[in-house]
UniProtKB/Swiss-Prot annotation:
The species this protein was found in: Rippkaea orientalis (strain PCC 8801 / RF-1)
Protein's job: This reaction introduces a second double bond into the aromatic ring system.
Protein name: Chorismate synthase
InterPro entries on file: Chorismate_synth (IPR000453), Chorismate_synth_AroC_sf (IPR035904), Chorismate_synthase_CS (IPR020541)
Gene that produces this protein: aroC
Subunit annotation: Homotetramer.
Domain of life: Bacteria
Length: 362
């Protein structure tokens, strides 16, 4: 239960961190879309471990295999299965964690819910589960780009108390990928890298905020009342490992304004389209896209598994301590960027198909 996401563009992820592999089954992808492993691999490479000194040193190529649903380079309209095999597991690093519960990790809650857990690498609660999401998100991005020229760009906005200055209306993928922390503010990026590296040497971890902008969004996406577009975006990104907060548009800062200060006033552009002079709504009003840029922010906590000794208990109820072994990210933010993009793409693609199905016939 709980492994499937979406309505018309529907994904089910599978696999564990130290199992044979991880992947996704996509149902509802339109037929005749040109797709190949290379379309998917680019985003998987951005997500994969071992890519820099500020990420986990686990070495995985994360090479994807399309198992079904594609023939002669085009989608068939049938379920698409994508598999990535695990190759660099070091399960012995987790022997101690078979008994000791990691503070603030899913160990204790999985044990409480199921009465059993895969302690090798965190099993299903590992961030390797997101490989399937990123693979499916790459296909969703291609649909959105081809149908509506939608562009989705995520980037690191903040690491701990270091915040970059980024204009979401002009930021490019090249700006984001110009450094290993994926912050488009070059000066702040260097400070972030130094802070993460120092935290790693201290056997600790830090968190931060990923901001994501979706541009060229068609008007009308979103389903009132329980499937509002921002509600589904929040559900999507808040289902990512280590996510702890969600904002759209002005977010919590909007509570400091009056209505006259916060309202996005309307005007007619040169083509007669209704536009807004500001975008404090973040591109969504009444749960439905208004055609402006959708801008969201996702807060990620510090990585739970750290090398510093902490107090904990065993699964048999004895107090003890744990200094975790294994290979872990000192900060999840650089690798979380393509994960956030993927969830945004999945939500927007699903709602695009729903909009066409309900309102696009007449």
């Amino acid at each position: 239960m709980g492994n499937t996401f979406g309505h018309l563009f529907r994904i089910t992820t599978f696999g564990e961190s130290h199992g044979g592999g991880v992947g996704v089954v996509i149902d509802g992808c339109p037929p005749r879309l040109e797709i190949s492993e290379s379309d998917i691999q680019y985003d998987l490479d951005r997500r994969r471990p071992g890519q820099s000194k500020i990420t986990t040193p686990r070495h995985e190529s994360d090479t994807c295999e399309i198992i079904s649903g594609v023939f002669e380079g085009k989608t068939l309209g049938t379920p698409i299965a994508i598999l990535v095999r695990n190759k660099d597991q070091r399960s012995q690093d987790y022997d101690e964690m078979s008994v000791k519960l990691r503070p603030s990790h899913a160990d204790a809650t999985y044990e409480a819910k199921y009465g059993i857990r895969n302690w090798q690498g965190g099993g299903r609660s590992s961030a390797r589960e997101t490989i399937g999401r990123v693979a499916a998100g790459a296909i969703a991005k291609k649909i959105l780009k081809q149908v509506a020229n939608v562009e989705i760009i995520g980037y690191v906005k903040r690491i701990k108390d270091l915040e970059g200055m980024v204009d979401p209306s002009t930021v490019t993928l090249e700006n984001v990928e110009s450094n290993i922390v994926r912050c488009p503010d070059p000066e702040m990026a260097e400070k972030m890298i130094d802070l993460i590296d120092q935290t790693r040497r201290n056997k600790d971890s830090i968190g931060g905020v990923v901001e994501c902008v979706a541009r060229n969004i068609p008007k009308g996406l979103g389903q009132p009342v329980f499937d509002k577009l921002e509600a589904d975006l929040a559900k999507g990104v808040m289902s990512l490992p280590a996510s702890k907060g969600f904002e759209i548009g002005s977010g919590f800062a909007g509570t400091l304004l009056t209505g006259s200060e916060h309202n996005d006033e309307f005007y007619l552009d040169e083509t007669g389209e209704i536009r807004t002079t500001t975008n404090r709504s973040g591109g969504i009003q009444g749960g439905i896209s208004n055609g402006e840029n959708i801008i969201i922010r996702v807060a990620f906590k510090p990585t739970a598994t750290i090398g510093k000794e902490q107090k904990t208990v065993t699964n048999t109820g004895e107090e003890t301590t744990l200094a975790a072994k294994g290979r872990h990210d000192p900060c999840v933010l650089p690798r979380a960027v393509p994960m956030v993009e993927a969830m945004v793409a999945l939500v927007l693609c699903d709602h695009l198909l729903r909009q066409e199905g309900q309102c696009g016939l007449f």
